[in-house]
């Protein structure tokens, strides 16, 4: 913690005599005696967590204990939950009403009063962890935690007068001056301005983030017993140098904009509400290479050097100091959900020469992607809150804290209407394949409620997967490396290989294997005490070392080096490859015969198989490096004999393979076989006059003329002929049932039997029509559009499609609560899976982000299922 963060002087305030019920059961064991008398003015210390306990939220603890009471079938799990209930967590002020209390919980004064009581019972200083979280345009890149205040001047004014000012006034009350209040300032805000500033919503929010954070720092820093910590994201977000460096610069710019400068910030906090591991014990060296490939280049780490939060906090501390912060600035890590224990946690190194397989097998972080942030399956509770944790000197840690209370949701799995400004983020939908995650499922836990609400299903998993295991059953960590291998010797070399052998190492538990290095590059892993390094260059000198490792991932120092020189590469190869086997002829045409065979091998130390010669009789008709070849230019209705020979790089040729005979087809083949029957015929969302159909493609017989198209039938009437596997039948009557089939036909005119029929009913005509309300908020070249659609008809719409067009070339870039598409100027919004039923008289609200070229005229004509709507 920075000495610059200490106040030059402190105010002495008259403290009112207050009584409060004790909360002994909720307070951890005291660490020291209380440093100051009850009447002393607060002293701003270097590390507020040192020698102090932390506040246990009784409201959250009650939820945890209630969950434990529902685990009567698993007493051990219930006991672990009750242990968790006694741990300190932060109190979140996530909207204005949270200050006085709302349906989601008690107000700030309730918690401060309880903190006073807990400190009195503990007899030592107490840290009250508080989260300031209501910026205008909050969480501009995600949707699940969007807030109540818009990113506008009016929103910023409300943030100051209705949110920060009342909080500061309450914290400045003399009744609470003995509490050390650690305020985490606006999670996700400033990091978004580094990585997501290209998003229109973040561009809109950027000036309000800077001004809002500055205002909060100024107001709270003026209170002597408040300690300001700025959120710095986590290693999987800002760990790359291209993100970390600009972020440190941004934090410094914001600090310098405040009245007190760098002194307004007491520290930084990482991994808030995230699940990035504190440590990756089996991947402790991010510079390690596997088969000459750095492990940080794996798909999971994407060239990021920071594999865990210990790496990241040390990295960020260096950059923050370089940006102007004092070297004593402190760091916090939120360990509430980054334990990653349970049955899927790897406990020993799994060897592999493939870098992705090596990383995936040995990382404790079991997410599909480091960007999977919402209620991730498999996560567990991490280290319990702890002041000044030892062993992490480079990270300059003030404490491990639980900023995100375990059991509180990150966001809803489905779209849940609410008055908190929280929207549905598909990253919280376990059925969503996200392009942000390399087109993988999100891995989110299903059935999640809104962000911040109690999510017991996830809490159960967090407790079960805790690491360290709750209750003291975590195995004692092995920190002792094996002895250094001795006696490393190089045997007789070849032009491309060096055999190595050595004397076995010993370990306090057990040696599990050895890593073999060529220079500084890891070239192999083995459980034996010998290894042959291959793929070397002839007549080249090399130096080799070996390291021993154990199941806990401890690795010894390198052995003494062994030098060896490969032989020259002038060995004459006079041995032919093996004879190709398994030569087979495939389906012929009138002029071609496809051939395939099993690969040949060359002699040990040989020059290697270079390719194959294909013979028709005794004539070479082709060469290839593959194990297949199609002979062309043949005569129809003729029998041929083929064989294959293998050649190596030195020019040695094998004997010919066993011959295979094949006869080309005659040139007058008549196709009389129809294509296969179309399958999978499905009707999509209908309108009042149309039914969209799709089906699976048919196939034609081998040697047939090929599928030419499909005939679509309404009952027994053919209504269309198409070449694709979809068609929309139009001109239908409203509220009418229809039956459709499809037949396939080939070029020769053969027609298949009809597919299985599919039934569909057109939508009823919406007597009364529909009403649309459209609004847009524009900035620079971007805008956000909101559309409210009302069904004025007398019947529910089971599936709906809204259509409209832009007049000025606007483009939809991202949408929500509907499936959005655009073709030219025409925009279509089809219902999402969860809001497809639109009852008579009810409305649905959808929206999108878009771009414009300076003119953003609102659409004036909308249709709902093909019926024109009126503008509201």
Curated annotation (Swiss-Prot):
Residues 763-872 form the CBM2 domain. Disulfide bonds join 140-202, 374-428, 770-869. SMART domains: CBD_II, FN3. Residues 484-569, 579-667, 677-765 form the Fibronectin type-III domain. GO terms for biological process: cellulose catabolic process. It is an enzyme of class 3 (hydrolase). It catalyses: Hydrolysis of (1->4)-beta-D-glucosidic linkages in cellulose and cellotetraose, releasing cellobiose from the non-reducing ends of the chains. The active site is at residues 188, 410. One of its GO terms (molecular function) is polysaccharide binding. It holds the Pfam family CBM_2. CDD domains: FN3. Residues 41-477 are annotated as: Catalytic. This enzyme hydrolyzes 1,4-beta-D-glucosidic linkages of cellulose. Weak activity against carboxymethylcellulose, bacterial microcrystalline cellulose and barley beta-glucan. Also has weak endoglucanase activity. Hydrolyzes glucosidic bonds with inversion of anomeric configuration. Belongs to the glycosyl hydrolase 6 (cellulase B) family. This is Exoglucanase A. It comes from Cellulomonas fimi (strain ATCC 484 / DSM 20113 / JCM 1341 / CCUG 24087 / LMG 16345 / NBRC 15513 / NCIMB 8980 / NCTC 7547 / NRS-133). The lineage of its organism: Bacteria, Bacillati, Actinomycetota, Actinomycetes, Micrococcales.
């Amino acid at each position: 913690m920075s000495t610059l963060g200490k106040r030059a002087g402190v105010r002495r305030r008259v403290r009112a005599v207050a009584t409060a019920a004790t909360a002994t059961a909720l307070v951890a064991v005291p660490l020291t005696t209380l440093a100051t008398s009850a009447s002393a003015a607060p002293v701003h210390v270097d590390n507020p967590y040192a020698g102090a306990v932390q506040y246990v939220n009784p409201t959250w603890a009650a939820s945890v204990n209630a969950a434990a009471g529902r685990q009567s079938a698993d007493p051990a799990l219930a006991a672990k939950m009750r242990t968790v209930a006694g741990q300190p967590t932060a109190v979140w002020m996530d909207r204005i009403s949270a200050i006085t209390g709302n349906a989601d919980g008690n107000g700030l004064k309730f918690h401060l009063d309880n903190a006073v009581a807990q400190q009195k019972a503990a007899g030592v200083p107490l840290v009250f962890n508080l989260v300031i979280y209501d910026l205008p345009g909050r969480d501009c890149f995600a949707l699940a935690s969007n807030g109540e205040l818009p990113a506008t001047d009016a929103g910023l004014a409300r943030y100051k007068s209705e949110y920060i000012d009342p909080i500061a006034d309450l914290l400045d009350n003399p009744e609470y001056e003995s509490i050390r209040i650690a305020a985490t300032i606006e999670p996700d805000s400033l990091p978004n301005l580094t990585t997501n500033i290209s998003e229109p919503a973040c561009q809109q929010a950027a000036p309000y983030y800077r001004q809002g954070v500055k205002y909060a720092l100024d107001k709270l820093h003026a209170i002597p017993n408040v300690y300001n910590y700025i959120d710095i994201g986590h290693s999987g977000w800002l760990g790359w140098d291209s993100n970390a460096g600009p972020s440190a610069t941004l934090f410094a710019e914001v600090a310098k904009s405040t009245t007190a400068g760098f002194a307004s910030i007491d520290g930084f906090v990482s991994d808030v509400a995230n699940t990035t591991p504190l440590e990756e014990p089996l991947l402790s060296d991010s510079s390690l290479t596997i088969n000459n490939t750095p492990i940080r280049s794996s798909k999971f780490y994407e060239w990021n050097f920071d594999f865990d939060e210990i790496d990241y906090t040390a990295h960020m501390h260096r950059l923050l100091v370089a940006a102007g912060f004092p070297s004593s600035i402190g760091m916090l890590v939120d360990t509430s959900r980054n334990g990653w224990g349970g049955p899927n946690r790897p406990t020993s190194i799994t060897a592999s020469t493939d870098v992705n397989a090596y990383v995936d097998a040995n990382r404790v972080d079991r997410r599909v992607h480091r960007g999977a942030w919402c209620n991730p399956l498999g996560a567990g509770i991490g280290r319990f809150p702890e002041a000044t944790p030892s062993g992490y000197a480079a990270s300059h840690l003030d404490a491990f804290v639980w900023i995100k209370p375990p059991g509180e949701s990150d966001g809803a799995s489905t779209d849940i209407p609410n008055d908190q400004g929280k929207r549905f983020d598909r990253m919280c939908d376990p059925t969503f394949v996200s392009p942000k995650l390399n087109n993988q499922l999100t891995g989110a836990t299903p059935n999640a409620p809104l962000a911040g609400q109690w999510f017991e299903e996830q809490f159960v998993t967090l407790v079960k997967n805790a690491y360290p295991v709750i209750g003291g059953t975590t195995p004692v960590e092995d920190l002792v490396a094996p002895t250094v291998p001795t006696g490393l010797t190089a045997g007789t070399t070849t032009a491309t290989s060096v055999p190595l052998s050595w004397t076995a190492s010993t370990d306090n538990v057990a040696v599990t294997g050895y890593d073999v290095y060529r220079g500084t590059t890891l070239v192999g892993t083995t459980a034996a005490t010998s290894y042959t390094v291959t793929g070397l260059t002839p007549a080249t000198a090399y130096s080799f070392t070996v390291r021993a490792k154990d199941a806990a991932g401890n690795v010894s120092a390198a052995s003494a080096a062994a030098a060896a020189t490969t032989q020259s590469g002038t060995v004459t190869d006079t041995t032919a490859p093996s004879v190709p086997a398994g030569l087979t002829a495939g389906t012929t045409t009138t002029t071609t015969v496809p051939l395939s065979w099993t690969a040949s091998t060359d002699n040990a130390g040989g020059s290697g198989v270079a390719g194959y010669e294909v013979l028709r009789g005794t004539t070479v008709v082709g060469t290839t490096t593959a194990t297949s070849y199609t002979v062309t230019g043949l005569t129809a209705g003729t029998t041929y004999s083929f064989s294959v020979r293998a050649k190596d790089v030195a020019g040695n040729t094998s004997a010919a393979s066993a011959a295979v005979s094949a006869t080309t087809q005659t040139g007058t083949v008549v196709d009389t076989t129809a294509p296969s029957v179309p399958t999978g015929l499905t009707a999509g969302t209908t309108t009042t006059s149309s039914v969209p159909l799709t089906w699976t493609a048919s196939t034609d017989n081998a040697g047939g003329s090929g599928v030419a198209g499909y005939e679509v039938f309404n009952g027994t009437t053919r209504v269309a002929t198409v070449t694709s596997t979809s068609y929309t039948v139009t001109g239908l009557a409203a509220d009418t049932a229809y039956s459709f089939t499809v037949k396939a036909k080939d070029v020769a005119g053969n027609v298949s039997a009809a597919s299985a029929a599919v039934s569909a009913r057109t939508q009823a005509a919406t007597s009364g029509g529909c009403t649309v309300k459209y609004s847009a908020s524009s900035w620079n070249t971007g805008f956000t559009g909101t559309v409210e659609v009302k069904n004025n008809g007398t019947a529910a719409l089971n599936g709906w499609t809204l259509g409209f067009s832009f007049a000025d070339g606007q483009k939809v870039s991202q949408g929500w609560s509907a499936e959005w598409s655009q073709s030219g100027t025409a925009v279509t919004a089809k219902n999402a899976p969860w809001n497809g039923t639109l009852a008579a008289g009810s409305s649905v609200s959808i929206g999108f982000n878009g771009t414009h070229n300076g003119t953003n005229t609102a659409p004036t004509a909308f249709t709902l299922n093909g019926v024109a709507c009126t503008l509201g």
